[in-house]
Amino acid sequence: MKLKTCITSLALLEGLVCISAQNAKIIPANTIAITPTDSKELIIEKAAHVIPTKNQLDALRNEFIAFIHFGPNTFTHMEWGNGMEDPKIFDLKELDTDQWCKSLKDAGMKMVILTVKHHDGFVLWQSRYTDHGIMSTNFRNGKGDILRDLSKSCQKYGLKLGLYLSPADLYQIENPKGLYGNLSQYTKRTIPREVPGRPFSNKTKFEFEVDDYNEYFLNQLFEILTEYGPIHEVWFDGAHPKTKGGQKYNYEAWKKLIHTLAPKAVIFGQGDVRWCGNEAGVTRKTEWNVLPFNNKDLTEITGLTDWEEDNIGRRDRLYDAHFLHYQQAEVDTSIREGWFYRDDVYQKVRSADDVFDIYERSVGGNSTFILNVPPNREGKFSDQDVKVLAETGKRIKETYSKDLLQGAKGSKQVLDHNDITYSLLSNNQLIVESKLPITINRIVLQEAVSTHGERVESHAVDAWIGGKWKEIAAATNIGYKRILRFSEVTTRKIRLRVLQDRGSVAISSIAAYYYKMRPPQLTILQDKTGKVSIDEKKQPFDWKNQDKKDIKDKDKDFNIYYTTDGSEPGINSLKYNGPFEKEQGTIKAVAILKGEPGAVQTEVVGIAKNKWKLSESKDGTKNHSAEAAFDANPKTFWQSTNQNIPQSLSLDLGALYTLTGMAYTPQTAFGGGMMAKGIVEISADGKKWETASAFEFGNLVNDPSKRDLYFKQAVKARYVRVTAQEVAGNSQALTIAELDFF
């Protein structure tokens, strides 16, 4: 049968290849179609020929990039605004984008993405098409332009610039004259719309058949893509706090404009780059970037019902696809609890240990790491954040700037630190030998994804120790990059073995490094009786990369010290020897290894729950009784049988306490029933109630982390009633994994 190929022009793609012959030569492409007659073997062969575009490859090479969330939420202490905030709430006096960029550069980042418009519709640049933004604030007498400042600082510090422009727009929804969902007709419109006195230096014109809101969005895209220097990523969030009027987005028009005005930009959420499935920095054991899709728009991953599912590119899913397409993941999380800055007292900041760990798991797991660093109300990064960024960058540089295989004997194509050159493996093995013995605990592998795609499905690495090969690490796929972590070994020879593949394997790089072990991160837990335990944090990944017993004996001879009064712990503090009793206090703990302190872990502990009981009976679904909401086990949860709102849970704490706040832990079994908004009421006798505080927890579905609520003033109570007035997610039946009162 003769080879039959067809190239279809699709927005966002650099080629759609269709192969009809079972034995035809497959041309590498960004997207390859599957036909009904394709065998499973041919489908896997096609998958092995799916490659990134040049823009995608450049984005992969960025590896570590920054998010900056800044806007009215910074001043209202909220995660999501409502769109009706007075712009003057954004009460910025000073702005230091040079400090931002220097800090990000010190961390080893290569690009920064700014939320120029979040869901509230407030814009951070001098737009011609709205007055809901920086132009209506007192910042620089209404003449300030945060995007302009950041663009200049990026150029100064050699950082690429990306833009987050939320398709959702609560201002355009809530404003009586708003354009979102106003049921306007689709008519031919010229982009950009001319505004008297504000001409564009870029004279490019577009004609699209769109409605009012799509025109508004396109006009704003035109502004930010033509007046602020080169743009390398455009980020379209999929979150929608609210919709109206059946508003649809004309993504094809948006993409055409972006491809024309920002030809080097990748687009998040529309074919180029995708979400990793969580906002907590959790990475998959296996992260394929060659994915199965149902449609040409590349919006429906075959078989995917939940973005948090594991291994979304596995073989059995490929067999059911209509298209195979390269779409890389970004692992996005925040350096702080929440996307926006709230305060420097209660809002916790990730340690450098934590950030460096996520860096190795994401960049070393075939993904890009995007870390949010939110500026404070003084227009700067807080000191805590800057210190963490500097320490993270120091560790990255100390660990990965010197390849210990430099000058080693082996294929020069895998030792030249060039991800374009490669070596095709013979017998699926590769051996390199150093001139002298080297001590290592990191191996970095890369496939030649730009020419040969992703082919390794599982692999192992051996070291020559004591006259024989010893396996020191193993994992699943490799892709753009895989970082293997293991206990330190000293060797001269390293062997890569590919155990399963999708075709002839092309390795572009193998490198070896040494990471100086630090004291571990800690976790602080309180049980139902009030006893507090402190232990090493369990890492959220499961690579076959470390012999736990060996590490415990060799590398982890550390002690834990703690305080119970909120003061900083050190070697002169209480030494942890086992669980201790503590109610209503702030525990701070640190591990010290060979005189070096690790990151300080802080946890506010509440009232012991062994005397708590329901003051009003509440039904729960099977295996999810109301008592699970206060059993000191965040893995269990109460799920109400009632789907009506409001819903409440009333508790008898067993005695009269002075309370300063509450903590709510959402369940993580599914994305629904989360307590987004409500009130906390207190009572001394269970009959007469008064409100202690209202609460609103944003972004729970994407980030179901523990949320703290501090009352404006301390209250005395024996009885507490928590009422949910709004529930987030795909189920209205209220769920609570844990309630704490402190």
How does the language model describe each region?
Residues 1-25:
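Bacterial Sec-dependent N-terminal signal peptides
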Residues 23-487, 497-509, 723:
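Mature catalytic domains of secreted/periplasmic carbohydrate-active enzymes
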Residues 113-116, 598, 682-683:
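Ser/Thr-glycine-rich phosphate-binding loops at phosphate-binding pockets of nucleotides
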Residues 380, 384, 388-391, 399, ...:
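Aromatic, loop-rich ligand-recognition surfaces of beta-strand-rich domains
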Residues 473-477, 568-576, 699-700:
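Short beta-strand segments within Ig-like beta-sandwich modules, predominantly Fibronectin type-III
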